[in-house]
Amino acid sequence: MAKEQPNDLTEQLTDTPKTAVEQAETMQSVPQTIVKKTGTALSLLAILVALGIGGAGYYFGQQQMAKIQQKLTALENQTGANLSSNNTNNNKRLTQLEQSLKTAQENIAQLEQLIVSKTGEITSLQTQMKQVSQLAIAQQPSDWLFSEADFLLNNALRKLVLDNDVDTAVSLLKLADETLVKVNNSQANEIRSAINQDLKQLLSLSSVDQNAIMQKLSQLANTVDELQRL
């Protein structure tokens, strides 16, 4: 029995250090477990925060996109309205220009008709002048006045027909009338009466400024070209 006691004591002593070591290892493993659990919790919290921030960013981003889309839609509507208004104004302007062009063309047509009419009348006057001149040669020495008046009428006719120069034609007719005043002849008076009638008509015609009409027509043509390009 005495021999067995030392062995038991040895076993107890041997078991005691092992238990202490195990206890120490167990105590060391507890904080590690706590640290691991704490790190996992922090990671989850960070992920949740990141997800929350990302969701908020996505929400605000969607709001901004919606606002931008609204502004684009409003801008498109405004642009469409402006284009429609511009087209309406351009159509009105084009209508006005077409009306002005039509009026100018009518004035030019009237001018051409009157020139043709006056050309025939002046030609008739020339014929009468020749007849009167032939009679006057035998009656009085004023035939040179008839010749001068005939020359003036020829020039007036040329200016009117070839150059469409109404003002110069009027001046020449006035000179012819002043020349015939010096002739004491009933036929000369008849010619003067016809010249005065032509002068009245040509003076009313000269109020139409042909250069102004042509300039206006050119401006109208340029404006029509610009609208077509629009």
Curated annotation (Swiss-Prot):
Q: Which family does it belong to?
A: To E.coli HemX N-terminal region.
Source taxon at top rank: Bacteria
Organism of origin is Haemophilus influenzae (strain ATCC 51907 / DSM 11121 / KW20 / Rd)
Stated name of the protein: Uncharacterized protein HI_0603
Instruction: Return the InterPro entries for the record.
Output: HemX
